[in-house]
Structures are given as C-alpha cells and as structure tokens.
Amino acid sequence: MAKRCEVCGKAPRSGNTVSHSDKKSGRWFRPNLQKVRVVLPDGTIKRMRVCTSCLKSGKVKKYVGQVSEV
C-alpha cells in the first residue's frame, strides 16, 4: 500500500539530514497519514488514508458513528 494521501496525492519526498559539520545524508520526508472513515458525497462510508492537512482543512468529512439514545 502506497504512503500517499488518497485525497490530495501527497507522497513521500526525498531530502537530506544535515549535520553540524554540513555533512548530508539522504532521508525521506513522509506525509502524516491517518486511516479514517470518511463520508463520501453520495453518503457511503469508506476507510481512507488521508494526510492531516486534508483533515484540518476540511477536504474530507469524518464519519462520527451512530449516537445511541439513553
């Protein structure tokens, strides 16, 4: 399964870890993905891998669940 946001397509990017002596070694910057249940526009519920920036910006609507009446 790809480490990619299913909403915006954000994917891992390569970069460098830079030490104090300015030596560079390669590393990966990965998106902060969360598995959430999402309510789709047609009303169905689907589990998706979504980055936190999409959750915070409101691009997806989280499924809250059934509320039981007491």
Swiss-Prot record:
<dbReference type="InterPro" id="IPR001383">
    <property type="entry name" value="Ribosomal_bL28_bact-type"/>
</dbReference>
<dbReference type="InterPro" id="IPR034704">
    <property type="entry name" value="Ribosomal_bL28/bL31-like_sf"/>
</dbReference>
<dbReference type="GO" id="GO:0005840">
    <property type="term" value="C:ribosome"/>
</dbReference>
<keyword id="KW-0689">Ribosomal protein</keyword>
<dbReference type="Pfam" id="PF00830">
    <property type="entry name" value="Ribosomal_L28"/>
</dbReference>
<protein>
    <recommendedName>
        <fullName>Large ribosomal subunit protein bL28</fullName>
    </recommendedName>
</protein>
<comment type="similarity">
    <text>Belongs to the bacterial ribosomal protein bL28 family.</text>
</comment>
<dbReference type="GO" id="GO:1990904">
    <property type="term" value="C:ribonucleoprotein complex"/>
</dbReference>
<dbReference type="GO" id="GO:0006412">
    <property type="term" value="P:translation"/>
</dbReference>
<dbReference type="InterPro" id="IPR026569">
    <property type="entry name" value="Ribosomal_bL28"/>
</dbReference>
<feature type="region of interest" description="Disordered">
    <location>
        <begin position="1"/>
        <end position="26"/>
    </location>
</feature>
<dbReference type="GO" id="GO:0003735">
    <property type="term" value="F:structural constituent of ribosome"/>
</dbReference>
<keyword id="KW-0687">Ribonucleoprotein</keyword>
<dbReference type="InterPro" id="IPR037147">
    <property type="entry name" value="Ribosomal_bL28_sf"/>
</dbReference>
<dbReference type="InterPro" id="IPR050096">
    <property type="entry name" value="Bacterial_rp_bL28"/>
</dbReference>
